[in-house]
Every structure is written in C-alpha cells, then in structure tokens.
Regions:
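Structural signal for membrane-spanning alpha-helices in multi-pass inner-membrane proteins
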Residues: 21-25, 54, 58-61, 194
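Polar-ligand-bearing catalytic/cofactor-coordination segments
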Residues: 22-43, 97-186, 201-238
C-alpha cells in the first residue's frame, strides 16, 4: 500500500489554518463561553492530530521508498524525490508557522493576563453549598476556588470591602468555577500551551480559555443573584 502523501499538505494546511483562526476567535465566544471552551479545545486537538498524521505519513513515505529502492534500483531519482517531498512540505509549513507566530505574538502581548494563584493557609469561615469557605488574613482583595481540597478562599480585605449581598455573589461565582471544573480546564489549556509552545496561537487559546471560564462563572452566578450586585462586587477585585 502506497503512503497517502496527499494527507501531508492537507494536514499541514489545517495546522496553518488553525494558527490563523486562533487570534481571530479572541472574544468571539463571550456570549457562549461553554461553546467557546469546547471549540478552542477541538481546534487544537484537531490540529495536533493533523500534525501527528503528517509526520507519520512522512516517515512512512521514507520507509516505503527505501524499500522500493532496494527492489527497483532503476527508479533511484524518483524514489529520492518522493522521499524528500514530505519533508520539504514540513519545512515549508514550519516557515509559514513561524511567520504566523510573529503576528500572533502581538495578540498574546495585548491580551495576556497574569493570574496569581495564592496558596495560603485559611481559617474556616462558613460552608457554602457543601464547600468550605476559608478566610485568609491579608489585606489584598481576592477570592479563589480550589479543587484539592475543594474550598473557596477569600481574603480579609475582600470581606471588609464587600457587602453581604456582594459576598454572596462572589461565593456563587467561585462555586460556578468548581461546578464546571474550570480549574482542570485551565490547567489543560496551559499544558497545551506549554507542549505546543512553538505555536504561539496556543498561548492565545490558554488566555481565552481562562477568560471564558470567568464569563461562564459570571453567568452561573447571575442566575442566582442580582447581576448589578455581581458587577459591583467584581469592581472591587480590580
């Protein structure tokens, strides 16, 4: 069976298209964050599969043509051409990706948001929807949901700034992260960005997944509290 060389340019074309699509999608799924999260992961999963398929066919082609060379030595030139063709395509795709990366890097710089995750000891404050809420004795204003163990941390500074209604809204927002397992999704997105660091668009995906998780948690909270109260609470965390 001959290696399907036509898959190499098709697969590489999809990898390039995915790299182009990524920055264009930024902010596109704000009204449908769940769909956005699924779409981002599907985009990079499909491009990853395409890249692996292209490499597999390229290696298969080399092995096949060397075997063919042993049987039909008179077709030496043709065999060499067929052996080199997939690798030339891979090299061309690499150049194209590097050019795209230069453009996407500008998007990363504009939209990159650093997220500091404090790992601090807290004191039990209350239980919310079966989840322990702990207060951390620092004056900075922050709140964060943790999965292991499952709990919500909130700073003393935040408790001082928030009204009772705003505190309730913050708890629903953080509980929304836990209910949808957003921490796991964000870790997966960061892992993809790390493994596919040569594709700058993966970093755009990581930041967009993080933003969409925040939007989804807001939507979850707004079904249970006054949206204006949630907006007021969020303003105190900026």
């Amino acid at each position: 069976m001959n290696p399907p060389l036509v898959l190499v340019p098709l697969a590489l074309e999809w990898v390039v298209i995915a790299s182009i699509i990524a920055p264009l999608w930024y902010g596109f799924f704000t009204k449908r964050p769940r769909l956005g999260i699924a779409s981002w992961f599907l985009l990079f999963l499909s491009s990853g599969i395409a890249l692996v398929a292209a490499l597999f066919v390229a290696v298969w082609s080399v092995a096949y043509n060397f075997e063919n060379l042993e049987k039909h030595s008179e077709s030496l030139v043709l065999t060499i051409v067929y052996s080199l063709a997939p690798w030339i395509l891979l090299a061309m795709a690499g150049v194209a990706l590097n050019l795209i990366n230069l453009r996407v890097e500008l998007v990363v710089q504009n939209f990159k948001q650093l997220m500091a995750v404090p790992v601090l000891p807290g004191k039990h404050l209350r239980t919310f929807q079966g989840v322990t809420v702990e207060v951390v004795e620092i004056e900075s204003v922050f709140a964060i949901a943790l999965n292991r163990p499952k709990k919500i941390l909130i700073s003393r500074g935040a408790l001082t700034e928030l009204s009772v209604a705003e505190f309730e809204a913050v708890l629903w927002h953080e509980y929304g992260h836990l209910a949808a397992r957003h921490n796991a999704l964000k870790r997966l997105a960061k892992m993809v960005a790390l493994l596919a660091g040569f594709i700058r668009a993966s970093k755009v995906m990581s930041h967009e997944i993080e933003r969409l998780c925040e939007v989804a948690a807001d939507n979850y909270a707004m079904k249970r509290v006054d949206p204006l109260v949630l907006k007021s609470a969020r303003a105190k965390f900026q």
